[in-house]
């Protein structure tokens, strides 16, 4: 009898790399389009002082939609799409690191922990400059600014974000901070995303394994993998949200010290300030994680070398 708890993990050496990258870029773009509005909302909630403008995720969604229309929810999106590069670097580093660690440990938890942290280190080194620019674009609202910089608006004062205004933000960052400005908050990003990634993968495999005990033998593995993803994302989000709030403020407000930013946040808003944007983060993470997990597992299945297709149970 087959052990239903034996979830077969497709490793790097099992993949057709050409298929893996082509399908991967398409899948990542679809995910970005679907969850970007909540990424923007989370950023604004984390930066605003108290509840000066928005009273929560739903309130922010309605106000942005009324004020700026659907395009207001996609400010900075074109710039943000360049993170597709870091996304591919992330999965490549993750899979290669798992393969490397497998020579020293067969523990799936150890492989996931080390690979997740390493992948995030590589990805954040590419992502941070893109994030800095896109976050400043996210903070523009009808010609008003919530961050340090303000782009030029059109004659009607709508402040529509275009490539010219992206260049304007880049110019202002260079003038204010030089090239170092594009890596503002780099350490804070590493302190946010390395633990987030290192925690997510082990919890994902842990939840999937536990759910496999509860599911009938006939239940496809992809079902409890799809449930495990959001559970792992919620767990990681709760654990790392305080650092994510600090990271966002450092990058958008031009802070130079993580510790001083933390102290200021605590003085202004108390411990609850560290949980700002958590609901938006979980809301955006839940559907995206389901798509990522189902998509990533399906992507790996589609990218299997032909001779291995029949050897995998789903």
Swiss-Prot record:
Disulfide links within the chain: none
Localization per Swiss-Prot or TrEMBL: Mitochondrion membrane
Entry keyword set: Amino-acid transport, Membrane, Mitochondrion, Repeat, Transmembrane, Transmembrane helix, Transport
Listed GO biological process terms: amino acid transport; branched-chain amino acid catabolic process; branched-chain amino acid transport; regulation of cold-induced thermogenesis
Membrane topology field: Multi-pass membrane protein
Induction comment: Induction by cold exposure in brown adipose tissues.
Keyword Transmembrane helix: yes
Domain of life the protein comes from: Eukaryota
Chain segments annotated as transmembrane: 20-42, 71-90, 113-133, 185-201, 222-239, 278-296
Pfam family, one: Mito_carr
Protein's UniProt keywords contain Mitochondrion: yes
Gene Ontology molecular function: any one: branched-chain amino acid transmembrane transporter activity
Main subcellular localisation: mitochondrion
Per-repeat ranges for Solcar: 18-100, 107-210, 220-302
GO cellular component terms, A-Z: mitochondrial membrane; mitochondrion
Family from the record: Belongs to the mitochondrial carrier (TC 2.A.29) family.
Biological role: Mitochondrial solute transporter which transports branched-chain amino acid (BCAA; valine, leucine and isoleucine) into mitochondria in brown adipose tissue (BAT). BAT is involved in BCAA catabolism and actively utilizes BCAA in the mitochondria for thermogenesis.
Protein name, UniProt field: Solute carrier family 25 member 44
Native species: Homo sapiens (Human)
Gene name, Swiss-Prot/TrEMBL: SLC25A44
């Amino acid at each position: 009898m087959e052990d239903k708890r034996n979830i077969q993990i497709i490793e790097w050496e099992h993949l057709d790399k050409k298929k893996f990258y082509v399908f991967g870029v398409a899948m990542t773009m679809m995910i970005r389009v679907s969850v970007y509005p909540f990424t923007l909302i989370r950023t604004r909630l984390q930066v605003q002082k108290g509840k000066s403008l928005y009273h929560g995720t739903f309130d922010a969604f309605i106000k942005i939609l009324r004020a700026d229309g659907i395009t207001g929810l996609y400010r900075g999106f074109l710039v943000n799409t360049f993170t597709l590069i870091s996304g591919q670097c992330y999965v490549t580093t993750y899979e290669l690191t798992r393969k490397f660690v497998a020579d020293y440990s067969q523990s799936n938890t150890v492989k996931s922990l080390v690979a997740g942290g390493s992948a995030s280190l590589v990805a954040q080194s590419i992502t941070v400059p893109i994030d800095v620019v896109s976050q400043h674009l996210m903070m523009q609202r009808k010609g008003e600014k919530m961050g340090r910089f303000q782009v030029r608006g059109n004659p009607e004062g709508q402040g529509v974000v275009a490539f010219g205004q992206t260049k304007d933000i880049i110019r202002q960052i260079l003038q204010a901070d030089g090239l170092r400005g594009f890596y503002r908050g780099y350490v804070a990003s590493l302190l946010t995303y390395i633990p987030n990634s290192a925690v997510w993968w082990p919890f994902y495999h842990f939840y999937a394994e536990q759910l496999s005990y509860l599911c009938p033998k006939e239940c496809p593995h992809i079902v409890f993998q799809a449930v495990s993803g959001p559970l792992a994302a919620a767990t990681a989000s709760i654990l790392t949200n305080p650092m994510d709030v600090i990271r966002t403020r450092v990058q958008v407000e031009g802070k130079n010290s993580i510790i001083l930013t933390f102290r200021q946040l605590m003085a202004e808003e108390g411990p609850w300030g560290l949980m700002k944007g958590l609901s938006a983060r979980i809301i955006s993470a839940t559907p995206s994680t389901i798509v990522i997990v189902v998509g990533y597992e399906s992507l790996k299945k589609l990218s299997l070398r032909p001779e291995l297709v029949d050897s995998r149970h789903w």
